[in-house]
Amino acid sequence: MNNSLENTISFEEYIRVKARSVPQHRMKEFLDSLASKGPEALQEFQQTATTTMVYQQGGNCIYTDSTEVAGSLLELACPVTTSVQPQTQQEQQIQVQQPQQVQVQVQVQQSPQQVSAQQLSPQFTVHQPAEQPIQVQVQIQGQAPQSAAPSIQTPSLQSPSPSQLQAAQIQVQHVQAAQQIQAAEIPEEHIPHQQIQAQLVAGQSLAGGQQIQIQTVGALSPPPSQQGSPREGERRVGTASVLQPVKKRKVDMPITVSYAISGQPVATVLAIPQGQQQSYVSLRPDLLTVDSAHLYSATGTITSPTGETWTIPVYSAQPRGDPQQQSITHIAIPQEAYNAVHVSGSPKALAAVKLEDDKEKMVGTTSVVKNSHEEVVQTLANSLFPAQFMNGNIHIPVAVQAVAGTYQNTAQTVHIWDPQQQPQQQTAQEQTPPPQQQQQQLQVTCSAQTVQVAEVEPQSQPQPSPELLLPNSLKPEEGLEVWKNWAQTKNAELEKDAQNRLAPIGRRQLLRFQEDLISSAVAELNYGLCLMTREARNGEGEPYDPDVLYYIFLCIQKYLFENGRVDDIFSDLYYVRFTEWLHEVLKDVQPRVTPLGYVLPSHVTEEMLWECKQLGAHSPSTLLTTLMFFNTKYFLLKTVDQHMKLAFSKVLRQTKKSPSNPKDKSTSIRYLKALGIHQTGQKVTDDMYAEQTENPENPLRCPIKLYDFYLFKCPQSVKGRNDTFYLTPEPVVAPNSPIWYSVQPISREQMGQMLTRILVIREIQEAIAVANATTMH
C-alpha cells in the first residue's frame, strides 16, 4: 500500500486544533469528556456558527448577532419543561373563629376547555389527563343565639304598618356557558375549564331565623363580544424570543364589586378562587412574583381564557403598626365572576359578611340593593380597569342603569363606595338591637321574598372607554399605525406649505416621510421620531399622554427588531437627538390621579421592555439600563443624585444557607439604605439594607446573574472604586469582547435620560408608592 503521509497530522496535533474551536466556557467540559470518552468526544464539540453582523455608524461599528444574549450569559439559558398535573378532587375544611361557627367545604373537579396555544410559551409543555369536570362548592353555616324578632320601621319601606321580619330566602344563579377561543394558525391545547359553584348559608338572630342562599355557576370564559376581537387575540400572545416561557403581564386587580344606597349599610359577598387559601399570608405588601410554571396552575394566580393573568398581592413577614393593612387581603376574581347581574324585587335587602382567619384576613364588600323597579347592575366589564388603593381597600366602580320602572332608559352615574364616606345617620324609627346581636357579622333586613338574579346578554353591557384599556404587551402594528398616520399628516402639511411658497433655485426634492418604517433611512427615522414626540395625535386629534407616547415608541422599536432592523432608537448614537426630545416629554411625568382619588397605572410595563430588548444583556447600553432598573426597583433610588452615590464598594454580595437544608444557598446583593444618615459607630442591622435577590426560575432576568455579568465586562481596575457604579459603554464592542465599558462613569445628563424612562414603568411606580405608604405608617 502506498498511502501518502504528507497531509496527515498526529492525533495530539488534531486535539490542539480541535481545542481552538471549542468555546471558552465549554473548555473544562471538553477536557473532561476527552479524558473519559477519548476520540469520541471530538465529535460532540462542534463550534456552532452564529451569524454576526457589524454595521457602520459614522466612526463606530455596532454589532448584532443571532444569539439573543451576549457572551458567557448564554450558558444561563436553560429551557424549562413543566408538567401541570390537575387536581382531581380536593376537600378543604376551614374553621373560622367568629361570633358564630363557620364551616367551609370546597370540592374541586376539572374538565378541559379549548383555548389557543398562544397563552402558553413555546417551550412550555402541558400534560393533561382525561376529561374531568370541575366543581367548587362552598358552604358556610352559622348559628347565633335566637331572640325575639324586633319590629323595625324605616322610611324606605312603603307599608302602612310596621312589618315583622320573617324568614327570607335569596337564591342567586349565575350561569355562563363554556366558550371556545381559537387563534389563527396556532395549535390548540387543552387546559382546565373551571366551573365554580358556591353556596352560602348563614343564620341571624335579628329575625328569628333568616336564611340566605347564594349559588353561582360561572364558566371562566369571555363574553362573546370579546372573542371576535383580534386585539384581544393578540394580547394573549407571549413572546417567543427567549429560551424560557416568558412571564405574562400580571395585572394587580383585586376585585371588590360594591355600590350602596345612601343611608343604608352595605351588603357583602366575596368569591374566593380555588386553591388560593394557601397562598395568602398576612404580611408586608409586596407584589407576588410568580414564575412561568405558576402562571398556568391553580395556585398563586388565575389565567383566564382572555389571556389576562390575575396576580395576588401578598404580604411579607414584618409586623405593621397599622391594623387596617394587617386585616386586608386583596383577592383576584376573574372577570366573569362580576360580569353583569339582573336584579328584581321590591323591598331592600342588605347583608354583610366578614370572614377572618389567623393566617388570612379578608374583607370583601359587595352590595345588593333591590328597588321597586328592575335594575341592571353592570360593572365596567373590562378586566384591565385600574384598581387602586383607597383607604386600605381596593374597589371597582359599578355603573347602575335602570331598564324598567320609574327610571327607564336613564343611565345613572358611577358610584365608588368608600367606607369612610358611608353615611353616619341612621333612621330614627330603627330600634337598636341588643349588644349580643350587634356582634354578629351577618345583618339582614328584608321581608319574606325570593329574588332571582340572572345574567344579562353581553350586548347590553356598556363598552368601556378606550382610555381604560391598558395593554399587557407591546403591539408592533400599533406603533406602525401611529407612524403611518403621522407621516400622512406631516406629508400633507409639507406639500401644502410647498404650494404656498416659491421654490428657491437649486432646491432639492421635497422632503417626504416614508410610511414604511423598515425602508426609512436612519437620519429620516431619527428626525421623524423627534417630531412625533410633539406632533403625534390620537384619533380624536388630542396629544398622547407621555406614558402612552413612550409605549408607542416601544412598539416601534419592537417592530424594527422583528423586521430585521438592528437600530436601537433608545441607545444608538444616531438617535441621540430623539432621546433628548423624549426626555423633555417624560421628565415631568407624575402618576395621574382621578378626581375620585384613583391613581391610573402607566401604560408601560416591565414586561414590555424585556420584549423589545430594552432590558437584558443584548448590548452594553441595555445591560447598563437593566442594572439601573433593578437598583431603582429594589434599592428605591429615585433621583439622579441617589444613583450617583452608588459605587462598587457599597454594593455587597451575600450568600446565605437555607435553615432547613444547608445545601441550598441563596445569593443576594445588598445596599445600605440612606447611606450617610447613620451615626458613626452605630450597629448596622439587616433592616438597614435594601436587597436584590436572585431569580433561579429565569436566569436571564436574574438581578444577581446580570450584576455578575456586568462585573465580568468591566475593567478590573474599577471594580473596587467607591465613587462610581455606572460606566460608559464602549462605542465598538463584540459579544465575546472581554471589556464592554471604559473606566469613565456616564455623564449626569445621560443618567438622567435613562432614569426618566425607568420612572415611567408601572412596576417602578408601584414599588415607590408601596415604599411611601410604608414610611407614612
Swiss-Prot record:
Region entry Disordered, spans: 140-164, 219-240, 420-440
Keywords (A to Z) from UniProt: Acetylation, Cell membrane, Cytoplasm, Isopeptide bond, Membrane, Nucleus, Phosphoprotein, Transcription, Transcription regulation, Ubl conjugation, Unfolded protein response
Modified residues (N-acetylmethionine): 1
Pfam family, one: DUF3504
Domain of life: Eukaryota
Record PTM Phosphoserine, positions in chain: 346, 465
Entry's free-text remark on domains: The CARD domain may be involved in the regulation of caspase activity in the context of programmed cell death.
Name this polypeptide is given: Transcriptional regulator QRICH1
Taxon lineage: Eukaryota, Metazoa, Chordata, Craniata, Vertebrata
